[in-house]
Amino acid sequence: MKKNLLRFVLPIIMVVLLSSFAWHKFYVSVTQIDYVPNKKRIEITHRIFIDDLEKAFEKKYKKKVYLTSTKELSDAETLIKNYLKENIKISINKKPQEIVYLAREVEGDVLIFYTKIAISKKINTFEIFNSLLTNVYSEQQNIVHVNINSNK
């Protein structure tokens, strides 16, 4: 009798417990920054989920951009450049730097952006401001990996 009761009650308890947890999406972007001395530049790679970026653009520009699809807006590249410029700021030796947009590519449901900064002097201090997607998601986390002068 106890065995039969357990077979009946245990699945019900499991369903109730598991259904009390709501699925929550993880909001994250990853930025990799590498100083390449022989090229005298800093190379920057940003990885951002396509749907998150589209939502940010829709909120900011009040229109659907349809990134990476056949419906992508003709000015999408300009919107991307402007968005990155507004949300990523880097200072080296206490001086703001110009970040040059190079290209983008798609990897699954992630957009990868490539940018660079030309460097002519030794890097003594490095500061970054990264506010990607923070205007859309309060839970947004922007992870930044930095490798400069062999310091991580």
Segments from the language model and where they lie:
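N-terminal soluble domains immediately following signal/targeting peptides that reside
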Residues: 23-152
